[in-house]
Curated annotation (Swiss-Prot):
It holds the Pfam family TAL_FSA. It comes from Shewanella loihica (strain ATCC BAA-1088 / PV-4). PROSITE patterns: TRANSALDOLASE_1, TRANSALDOLASE_2. It catalyses: D-sedoheptulose 7-phosphate + D-glyceraldehyde 3-phosphate = D-erythrose 4-phosphate + beta-D-fructose 6-phosphate. The keyword Protease does not apply. This is Transaldolase. CDD domains: Transaldolase_TalAB. It comes from the Bacteria. The active site is at K132.
Length: 318
């Protein structure tokens, strides 16, 4: 009998949520996702030293201004790690826009263009890249523009239905609704423990998946942020799931049978009118968990981006 991971791959596309190339080689996912925290972690792997050195050298050639060099080195390093991953995965890499641009539509679009250009200069077509943006109103609007240009986007830090609905209405290629961070909030708020089937994060992704399929939206649903394999098993049948190496290993070492839980709707119903900005902001604001977790997620990614830049600045000044 195939292990749990292999069974799962026959139902749902598995994506590796890591910048660790050795882990990606081990589990052979279709795609991979990175974020500022994972890039920071990857930058400390000794085997990646040459990628940092290349980013530093490139940044110095672009500008004499130290602040600009730091920014350029950060972008180039994220792309360098993405390029290494693309040598292994047959599909796509998700590379994230600086979290400090989460409320800046024009800045997000400009950064996306820069990242795509760096990949293209390295011989990688934009069809293999997903630009990751936070699911703020501005991030969703930036994604809408980028999708029109043929640049596919992955909308992340997605915690509630209003965010998911706005992404579908914007024609976004893929969303990453979070599971584990939703569970964290509810456990802290209620003091309760939840079974995998009752897990508020699992329920959220299931509802989003069902809504998308019922209304015929093409946006890919890729569940993210898992705390245990129980959550993953409950979402068997989701379009894609992005999973960290520790849980991938647990699945590879398990023979728990996998049963498809999510199924596409048989009948498609036309959706209603799109959410206005005011409606989106009000609906989002009504969800205390989503408000808190989005803000926290953006802050934490920005902190890790800052740590990475401090490290790169020291290298540039050396």
């Amino acid at each position: 009998m195939a292990n749990t991971l292999e069974q799962f791959k026959s139902i749902t596309t598995i994506v590796a949520d890591t910048g660790d190339i050795e882990a990606i080689k081990r589990y052979q996912p279709q795609d991979a996702t990175t974020n500022p925290s994972l890039i920071l972690k990857a930058a400390q792997i000794p085997e990646y030293k040459h990628l940092i050195a290349n980013a530093i050298e490139w940044a110095k050639a672009q500008s004499d201004d130290l602040a600009q060099q730091v920014e350029d080195a950060g972008d180039k390093l994220a792309v360098n790690i993405g390029l290494e991953i693309l040598k292994i995965v047959p599909g796509r890499i998700s590379t994230e826009v600086d979290a400090r641009l989460s409320f800046d539509k024009a800045g997000s679009i400009e950064k996306a263009h820069k990242l795509i250009k760096l990949y293209e200069e390295a011989g990688i077509d934009k069809s293999r890249i997903l630009i990751k943006l936070a699911s703020t109103w501005e991030g969703i609007c930036a994604a809408k523009e980028l999708e029109k240009e043929g640049i596919n986007c992955n909308l992340t830090l997605l915690f509630c239905f209003a965010q998911a609905r706005a992404c579908a209405e914007a024609g976004v290629y893929l969303i990453s609704p979070f599971v584990g961070r939703i569970l964290d909030w509810y456990k802290k708020d209620t003091g309760l423990e939840y079974s995998a089937a009752e897990d508020p994060g699992v329920v959220s992704v299931t509802n989003i998946y069902n809504y998308y399929k019922r209304h015929g939206y093409k946006t890919v649903v890729m569940g993210a942020s898992f705390r245990n394999t129980g959550e993953i098993i409950e979402l068997a049948g989701c379009d894609r799931l992005t999973i960290g190496p520790a849980l991938l290993e647990e699945m590879a070492n398990s023979d728990t049978p996998v049963v498809q839980k999510l199924q596409a709707a048989n009948e498609v119903v036309a959706p209603g009118a799109a959410l206005s900005e005011a409606e989106f902001r009000w609906e989002f604001n009504q969800d205390a968990m989503a408000v808190e977790k989005l803000a926290e997620g953006i802050r934490n990614f920005a902190i890790d981006q800052g740590k990475l830049e401090t490290m790169l600045k020291a290298e540039l000044e050396a």
